[in-house]
Each structure stands twice: as structure tokens, then as C-alpha cells.
From Swiss-Prot:
The lineage of its organism: Eukaryota, Fungi, Dikarya, Ascomycota, Pezizomycotina. This is Mediator of RNA polymerase II transcription subunit 10. One of its GO terms (molecular function) is transcription coregulator activity. InterPro entries: Mediator_Med10 (IPR019145). Coiled coil: none annotated. Signal peptide: none annotated. One of its GO terms (biological process) is regulation of transcription by RNA polymerase II. It holds the Pfam family Med10. It is found in: Nucleus. Its main location: nucleus. Residues 54-81, 143-165 are annotated as: Disordered. Residues 62-77 have a biased composition (Polar residues). The keyword Signal does not apply.
Length: 165
């Protein structure tokens, strides 16, 4: 059986929304027994659509015993449903009736702060490396070549390059 893709589920959800809209319209224009059969038919259609969605989104009991490539889709823009993993925090946000975009924004801000901290540490270590190299060159001139090799290996510039630029 081919994997159920995200676009398939998207289509099923759109169908359900359409059924709900039709039911809303039928209830709004309810005229009594003459429109009752139409309303019953629309509710049955909604029930069928919900059952189909439930079947498509049910956890696959064979997932743990099958190969990992089973859920790969041929279209990377339309992944298989069971290959998508959402962070539990996003699900908690939605369960709490919060906007998942807030979680995304907070997560991005947290990552940016962490990156700034790491950048600061990297620059501090680079400055320390340069100060240490300068002091080692002046204290032990015979190690100048080895110090330059270490500086170059750790991403710094040799003393001669720093003096030019």
C-alpha cells in the first residue's frame, strides 16, 4: 500500500470543512421535514469523511517491523504522513489553544541568544589565543614557527599576515 501523503490528509481536511459548511448552511435554512433528509445525508457524508480521515491517520501497527524507507514519498514537497515528527512542545501549544507560531518565534529567539553566546565565547578564545601567541613569541622566540603553525591550524592569522592586514 502506498504511503498516505500530507496532501492527501490536507484534501481530506478540506472535504471535512466543506461538509461542516454545508451542514451549517442546511441548519440555517432548515424548513422542517422537507429539508430533513438533505440534512441527514450531509451528516452521513461528514461521518464518512471523518472515518476516512481517522483510517488514514491511524498509527501503523507494522511501522516498527518494516523498513525505514517504507514511508518515504517520491515527492519531497509532499512527504508521507507517518514520516513527519512534530515536537511535543508544539502539540502542547495547540492543545492549550495557543498559536504554534509563538513557540516557533520563542524557539528562534532562544537559538539566536545561544548563537550570540557561542560567538562571544569563540571571539574571546580567539583573542586569548592571539594574546598567548604574542606573549609566547616574545618570551620564547625559538618557538615562533610552532606558534605560527598552531595559530594557523586554529583559524588565526600568522603574525606576518596580521601586520600586513
Amino acid at each position: 500500500m502506498a504511503p498516505i501523503t500530507l496532501s492527501t490528509i490536507d484534501g481530506k481536511l478540506k472535504d471535512i470543512i466543506q461538509h461542516l459548511f454545508e451542514i451549517q448552511s442546511a441548519v440555517h435554512g432548515y424548513l422542517g421535514p422537507e429539508t430533513q433528509q438533505e440534512l441527514v445525508r450531509k451528516i452521513k457524508n461528514l461521518t464518512t469523511a471523518l472515518q476516512t480521515l481517522s483510517l488514514h491517520t491511524r498509527d501503523d501497527p507494522t511501522a516498527s517491523t518494516t523498513a525505514p524507507n517504507q514511508y518515504q514519498s517520491t515527492n519531497p514537497n509532499d512527504p508521507a504522513l507517518h514520516s513527519i515528527a512534530l515536537p511535543p512542545e508544539i502539540i502542547d501549544y495547540v492543545d492549550a489553544a495557543r498559536n504554534p507560531d509563538i513557540y516557533t518565534r520563542e524557539f528562534v529567539e532562544l537559538v539566536q541568544r545561544g548563537n550570540q553566546d557561542l560567538k562571544g565565547k569563540k571571539e574571546a578564545f580567539a583573542d586569548f589565543r592571539d594574546v598567548l601567541a604574542r606573549e609566547m613569541r616574545s618570551a620564547m622566540p625559538e618557538l615562533r614557527g610552532e606558534v605560527d603553525k598552531v595559530i594557523q591550524a586554529t583559524g588565526g592569522k600568522k603574525q606576518s599576515e596580521r601586520e600586513r592586514g
